[in-house]
Each structure stands twice: as structure tokens, then as C-alpha cells.
């Protein structure tokens, strides 16, 4: 979420539903064996989201189709909104590493299977 927040312009917020993808098993093993909360993991590790492409809504289907055709798993991770018109539903991530950019609302629960 922090990386996404840094690339968004100030005044924008992306919503990211944690249930939108299945977290690879290794991250759940780290969480359970290390007794590490999900929020700590999501602040440190990518939890299976290796790259995010921010595209216009009308380009999302083409972008995911092209990625999949190239053998890269792809899905729509979230939607970008004007921050003033949006009510967060979870943990808001912003201002990371000193970047005054946008923000990300991370909500929902992770799927591990």
C-alpha cells in the first residue's frame, strides 16, 4: 500500500480490498510462526502483489488481459477516487518515506486459500 500511495498524486486515494487476491502460503506461514500481525506484514512485504500498474478505468481490462497473455498474473486491485469524496473503510496509508503523495485505504480480510 505504501508504494501505491507514493505514486498517486496528492488528493487521490485508492481503495484496496485485502480479499481481492489470495496471499501466497509463505506469508501466512511467516505470520503464524512469527506471531506477526497482518498489518505489520503488509507494511513490510508485498503479500503477493509484486507490481501495481495504475491505469485509466477504461484501460483496466486491456491491461490485465495483456499481462495474463504474457504469463503475468493480473487483476484489478482497486479503484482511485478523489480523496475529498471518499470515506475510508479501513487503514489509510499515506506520507510514507517522506513523500507527500496520495493515500491508500486498505480494508477487508486477507484470503490465504
Spans of features found by a protein language model:
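Glycine-/charge-enriched secondary-structure boundary and capping motifs
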Residues: 1-113
Amino acid at each position: 500500500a505504501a508504494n501505491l500511495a507514493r505514486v498517486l498524486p496528492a488528493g487521490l486515494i485508492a481503495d484496496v480490498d485485502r480479499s481481492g487476491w489470495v496471499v501466497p502460503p509463505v506469508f501466512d506461514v511467516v505470520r503464524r510462526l512469527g506471531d506477526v500481525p497482518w498489518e505489520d506484514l503488509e507494511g513490510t512485504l508485498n503479500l503477493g502483489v509484486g507490481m501495481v500498474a495504475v491505469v485509466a478505468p477504461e484501460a483496466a481490462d486491456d491491461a490485465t488481459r495483456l499481462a495474463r497473455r504474457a504469463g503475468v498474473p493480473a487483476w484489478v486491485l482497486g479503484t482511485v477516487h478523489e480523496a475529498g469524496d471518499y470515506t475510508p473503510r479501513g487503514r489509510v496509508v499515506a506520507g510514507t518515506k517522506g513523500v507527500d503523495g496520495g493515500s491508500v485505504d486498505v480494508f477487508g480480510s486477507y484470503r490465504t486459500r
